[in-house]
Design a protein with these regions (language model features):
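Contiguous segments within soluble domain cores/interaction surfaces
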Residues: 4, 8-11, 15, 39-48, ...
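Proline/serine/threonine-rich low-complexity linkers at boundaries of modular beta-sandwich domains
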Residues: 28-40
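Short coil/turn motifs at secondary-structure junctions
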Residues: 73-75, 143, 160-162
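Generic detection of short hydrophobic beta-strand segments and adjacent strand-loop junctions
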Residues: 100, 134-138, 144, 167-174
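Short Trp-Ser/Thr-centered turn/loop motifs at beta-strand boundaries
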Residues: 133, 150, 159-171
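Short glycine/proline/serine/threonine-rich loop/turn segments at secondary-structure transition edges
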Residues: 142-152
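Low-complexity, Pro/Ser/Thr- and charge-rich linker/hinge segments at domain boundaries
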Residues: 174-180
Length: 180
């Protein structure tokens, strides 16, 4: 395990582990580990992502696959105040460490034909005792229009006053003839 600047234990996973992760909301081998009294958001990401200039993924149209795997855990009363559209309040942020360009997006995966579900109503006293955990796996290029060039990004996720740990992702151009 690695320790970040705040002294928190962080998973140290090889970049290759993220190659087979698909977008969705499943827990997987790249999901950060949290303890029972954790409240907030944690993310994992590959340290390095390689891309071939001019090549696009036939399914996504993106120049690379930059996966972030995350977990969030909050008290029920906190999430209840954000309902029915919690997802519309989660923000993804990537900051270019050299140029200091900031890229942001809400993690909205809206289907305009699907209305937001009405949340069940529970007494506040009940919600204060309940903790809700959710997982997410996203390709940040589905949300952010990052330029196709070598760069290093500091990436994090926020929800109201909560901010995840910061991960650093380096985009590296594959040289001609280099294997994946």
């Amino acid at each position: 395990m690695q320790v970040n600047k705040a002294g928190e234990k962080m998973d140290n996973l090889p970049s290759e582990m993220f190659e087979n992760i698909e977008p969705g909301d499943d827990e997987n081998a790249c999901t950060p580990k949290i303890d029972d009294n954790f409240i907030g958001i944690r993310i994992n990401a590959p340290d390095v992502v390689y891309y071939a200039p001019g090549e696009k993924d036939p399914n996504t149209g993106h120049f690379a696959k930059i996966m972030i795997c995350g977990i969030r855990r909050f008290r029920g009363d906190f999430l209840s105040e954000l309902r029915p559209d919690v997802e519309k309040k989660v923000a993804l942020v990537a900051i270019d460490t050299q140029l200091h360009n900031v890229h942001t997006s809400l993690l909205i995966d809206d289907d305009p034909d699907e209305p937001d579900p009405s949340p069940p109503q529970f007494p506040k006293e009940t919600l204060e005792k309940v903790y809700i955990t959710a997982w997410f796996n996203i390709n940040i290029l589905d949300y952010l229009d990052l330029p196709e060039r070598p760069a290093t990004y500091n990436v994090f996720v926020t929800l109201k006053e909560y901010k995840s740990n910061v991960v650093t992702i380096k985009l590296v151009e594959k040289k001609t003839g280099e294997a994946d």
